[in-house]
């Protein structure tokens, strides 16, 4: 948005770029947003935190919305007098950096720190009130040394163990793939068919905390979104059921096949059992039958992701083995099936085709028996999965679920063929990753001593940072200086662990490190943690509901038990912001997919309502399809560059728009044209302030010396001035309630716009320009700008300074109860229920006076020609006169 030099010097014009740079420089110079841990014990502290970003190198609108939300709340609570901590850091390890490094042939460390520099500069242009003195990146040894130290403490406690885990293996790149890197059963980079492979990995015993993680969700009710709480409950998945043992007679090593079921009432309907390819019975069968061995190998190929298995075709093979049904004594065939995972439960399931959809599908495919044991409606087709009355179950016929559960348990438990059991869907957290760009695991592998923890004195175990990975295997294995070491236990030659930590480790405790980020003597300073934790308001996407948020809750409990923090939960309140959406433009391509285009490359026509009607690609003049409104993404080319928008309209306009256009927890449909509304609003505020300054100067007065509006006797103000004072203090009260109680971030902007309109009306209609009316106008403007500074801090503080306000001492304005009292109220007058007039009356006017005044109104009197049957008065609202005929 270009301007000529004379315009730039004109105070009546709003030039956001100039004032925003000026205000940001002031904030940086006086370290406005830095907070000390040495503040008074009596100070009210508040910790506001948005989920820290991965340093991709460029902000997107999702970032802008996320950080603006937490910044508005931070600025509001500072106005309320709180000591507010709003820090920023970088979730800097992880696969994206490694992949980018491979593609660009650059060391991930160099790529990452360059991106951090770019994103920090972008964040600062948004005017965020961040304490940058606490900034850190998780890929620095100063941070991850404490992660390594904490791992060693957990290892000593027995909360860490090592076991074989089944992973996705790319045989060409010789590397482990995350589930999302498996595309149609093939490696995303090499295109090679993915295999399952067992490799040793370290695990955290998160299941030891399953009950506490589940039960403590009750403490978050009303403070976290209910859908997030539900997702965590389902993810932990506490199930009460029965473990049933099916005897196996043909092996000295295997006495029973153990299965867990939440539906023991269907036990009499079991017609086969299914086991994973890695189960001991499957291996036993594979040793005897090459075809079964071949099938088991087939099952080991493909993704190990639960979601992928759910979509995959269910296949199986009869092992020829049988187990004994614990109730009937009948022999039940054992099948190996691809839908059973060894990593879930015992790696075996009892199959009841009549009452389980997956078992029903499998049984029909392989012509296996289907036995109904729950009374089923006659017209029902397929598997009947509801609970009900038992049938075809011998002595258990006629029992309901609870009755059959107890009866079967009473019969089987004395024979050690069943036991009551609680099982969790939650599995222990595998924290090993076969990747380079991550925190090294502080363990040593000794041929004689096994797995040995590193001496704490040797921490941090530093990751070599000058490595340029090629995507084939873990490069750490090929660095002798890193790998070769001595065993801390026996002193002999040994090798360092080359796996690195899951990056969820870094993001599980970063919030606590912000309390004492520069402490090089301990992971978390307890006194500082007690001062700031728990986080008062956490802001982030709902997509983190069951990974990051669950692991952070787990980590907090671990740190609590280590004496590092207090309290049971890390985040007191959680706000999950909605996604930012935008329209898409595309053409179908010959490959059967879609080619998406940037909006800047397309000429779009609109109808009278502003709806797009036609889109033409500028490059060839041919039409493109106007697609759905979808989440902004690189793949859809529908993202909006925040910096471009800031350069055009200013950061204050972008901040206002992202919060005004939709409630914070709902999706925001981006529209470039809609930015003009907030931009014009800020220009209006600018003009009103300039008008006030000019009017004050014309009377030879100074804004700093105007009397306080509250000190002026109300009798000296006309109705226009009283109305402006009333609106001013109504807005003070409403915004305080919206932000402090309701956490409604869009409605305050509407209130600010209403107040600006009221000020504009006052300026245009006020005929008595004097010290008193200027004082009322001044109060309204200072209030408007103070509250506006929460959303649009640059223009807000800049104009406040013009009005003589010290912005370093800014506080939330106090509502004046006297100003809220109305001298008159407007009442509606109806005749036979139809509005015929209005009247201004004093509050509390008696009913008879109201009736008389209503009938005297000219527009009402002409309808009172018949007999008056009834006169209804609703105090302070309306008078309704009922007339005959």
UniProtKB/Swiss-Prot annotation:
- The entry's ATP-binding residues are 634
Q: Which GO terms describe its cellular component?
A: cytosol
Chemical reaction(s) catalysed: tRNA(Leu) + L-leucine + ATP = L-leucyl-tRNA(Leu) + AMP + diphosphate
Q: Output the GO biological process annotations, alphabetical, semicolon-separated.
A: leucyl-tRNA aminoacylation
What's the EC number here?
A: 6.1.1.4
- Please name the InterPro entries in this protein's record: aa-tRNA-synth_I_CS, aa-tRNA-synth_Ia, Leu-tRNA-ligase, Leu_tRNA-synth_edit, M/V/L/I-tRNA-synth_anticd-bd, Rossmann-like_a/b/a_fold, tRNAsynth_Ia_anticodon-bd, Val/Leu/Ile-tRNA-synth_edit
List, alphabetically, the PANTHER family matched: LEUCINE--TRNA LIGASE, MITOCHONDRIAL, LEUCYL-TRNA SYNTHETASE
Which family does the entry's similarity section mention?
Belongs to the class-I aminoacyl-tRNA synthetase family.
**Protein name as annotated:** Leucine--tRNA ligase
